[in-house]
């Protein structure tokens, strides 16, 4: 906070100098942009950079516009950021794919080239590599697109990540190479378990390049990439360790990294929630939300939708949870993005929690087609959690007699899909869904059998909260001393984690019983 305040004071001085008509206003605007970026005020920094660009020419103006686009995209101002980015791409001679098909074709082409390239030699010879300003400008533009589009357009982000890595390899410059490898690793890891080996290779190469460059930002991005790989594959605690280490480096050694910090914080909170550490997650979330509001950081606020929603649910504050989902839905707009997905998961959860099963079921049905046709459908974790959330809403509806036959068939289909999924935690969620469906059908033996299969898998997947829900449901069905022991164990979990209304949480996360 003290550092941010110091940068804001510096920004005030630059503004005063500009207002007084000091010479070289383009330089003052650029320094104003840097001070604001250092303070975490990305949108304001972008405006200052654009002012500097309007007073500059040639490559300098292009670079200032690139920095403006970077901060706009990473502070949640996607439409304007994309408009400026496309101009920058034109300036440096990079094509923007006009269709998803064009992006896929480019991804395939660049990945084929990269697979026959060594990731090590450029790092070893980097210190002797010539610096081609045009090549570096092309890399910087491609990297801005790759990182800035991750949330709003995964396909084009992956395309530019491949191009940025190819350019970094050609340039042989270790700082840029480390950054490119980190972003590429995150994109590859999103595809799930079949891409694990390639993602790990990219992370290790990113770490080597960062060490070669002795650059803290490249090192933080390598740690962030490692966190993403762990998270996308369901390794919540390993993800948290890497992400928290990245946050430490970013805070202590880097400037103008509000976007990177937001990513470490949001995904750490998600990892805490999924592993069942609800008390710690809900302790962190309010200050992070307030910090994002203070900075007017729409990106961070939108990314915090689910953690903020969970925080209010744990406190049994339904109205506050619903307000979070309404704000997210109002901001999302346009084509289906990660923001829409987060709003869907949050809203459906709140609807089930408060007993609006018809609303949750309707939402689950309406999301299927937009999700399937979006680039998010390429993300294994998104596919798995979407199937699970849709299945939960279907079971809750069927249990209440809403569209019972269709809802049960949908839930069972989604459960079978999860049971066959190669991402480690998905089968556990599939068995939990099947247990709910069997219970709605009145088949207690099969419900118990499904819960018996689900519980060890949930524990192995470190899905602590869902394991507690499944344990309660199994205990309720079993009855007797054994059943009471299971229920009491879950009650201790809910009490330890500060859950105010476990009964409603069970209706939300393990319906049908």
What are the roles of these predicted feature ranges?
Residues 1, 29, 36, 72, ...:
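Residue at a conserved register position within TPR or TPR-like alpha-solenoid repeats
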Residues 1-75, 80-87, 131-180, 446:
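Extended alpha-helical scaffolding segments used for macromolecular assembly and cargo binding
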Residues 17-19, 50-54, 87-97, 165-169, ...:
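Amphipathic alpha-helical segments of tetratricopeptide repeats
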Residues 26, 33, 69, 146, ...:
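Conserved small-residue packing positions in alpha-helical repeats and bundles
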Residues 72-162, 190-201, 234-237, 241, ...:
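Amphipathic helix-loop-helix modules that constitute alpha-helical solenoid scaffolds
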Residues 404-467:
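Generic long, charged, amphipathic alpha-helical segments
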């Amino acid at each position: 906070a003290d550092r941010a305040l110091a940068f804001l004071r510096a920004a005030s001085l630059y503004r005063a100098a500009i207002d007084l008509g000091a010479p070289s206003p383009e330089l003052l605007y650029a320094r104003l942009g840097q001070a604001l970026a250092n303070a975490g005020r990305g949108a304001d920094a972008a405006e200052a950079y654009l002012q500097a660009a309007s007073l500059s020419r040639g490559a300098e103006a292009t670079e200032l516009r690139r920095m403006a686009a970077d901060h706009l995209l990473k502070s949640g101002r996607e439409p304007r950021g994309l408009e400026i980015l496309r101009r920058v791409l034109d300036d440096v001679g990079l094509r923007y794919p006009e269709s998803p098909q064009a992006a896929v074709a480019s991804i395939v082409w660049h990945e084929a080239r990269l697979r026959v390239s060594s990731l090590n030699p450029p790092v070893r010879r980097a210190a002797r590599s010539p610096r081609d300003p045009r090549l570096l400008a092309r890399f910087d533009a491609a990297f801005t697109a790759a990182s800035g589009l991750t949330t709003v357009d995964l396909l084009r982000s992956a395309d530019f990540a491949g191009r940025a890595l190819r350019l970094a390899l050609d340039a042989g410059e270790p700082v840029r190479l480390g950054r490119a490898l980190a972003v590429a690793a995150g994109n590859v890891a999103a595809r799930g378990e079949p891409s694990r080996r390639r993602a790990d290779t990219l992370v290790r190469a990113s770490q080597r390049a960062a060490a070669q460059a002795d650059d803290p930002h490249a090192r933080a991005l390598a740690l962030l990439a490692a966190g993403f790989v762990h998270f996308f594959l369901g390794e919540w605690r390993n993800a948290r360790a890497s992400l928290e280490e990245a946050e430490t480096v970013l805070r202590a050694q880097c400037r103008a990294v509000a976007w990177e910090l937001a990513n470490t914080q949001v995904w750490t909170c998600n990892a805490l929630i999924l592993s069942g550490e609800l008390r710690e997650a809900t302790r962190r979330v309010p200050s992070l939300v307030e910090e994002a509001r203070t900075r007017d950081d729409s990106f961070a606020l939108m990314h915090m939708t689910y953690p903020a929603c969970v925080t209010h649910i744990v406190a049994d504050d339904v109205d506050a949870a619903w307000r979070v989902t309404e704000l997210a839905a109002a901001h999302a707009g346009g084509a289906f993005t990660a923001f829409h997905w987060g709003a869907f998961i949050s809203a459906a959860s709140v609807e089930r929690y408060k007993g609006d099963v018809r609303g949750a079921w309707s939402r689950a049905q309406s999301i299927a087609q937009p999700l399937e046709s979006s680039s998010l459908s390429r993300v294994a974790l998104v596919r798995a959690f979407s199937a699970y959330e849709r299945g939960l809403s279907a079971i809750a509806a069927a249990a209440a007699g809403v569209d019972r036959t269709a809802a049960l068939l949908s839930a069972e289909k989604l459960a079978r899909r999860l049971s066959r999924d190669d991402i480690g935690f998905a089968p556990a969620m599939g068995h939990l869904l099947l247990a709910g469906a069997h219970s709605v059908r009145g088949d207690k033996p099969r419900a118990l059998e499904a819960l018996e299969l689900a519980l060890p898998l949930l524990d192995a997947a470190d899905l602590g909260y869902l394991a507690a829900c499944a344990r309660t449901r199994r205990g309720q069905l079993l009855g007797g001393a054994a059943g009471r022991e299971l229920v009491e164990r879950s009650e201790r979990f809910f009490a330890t984690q500060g859950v105010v209304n476990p009964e409603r949480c069970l209706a939300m996360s393990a319906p049908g019983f």
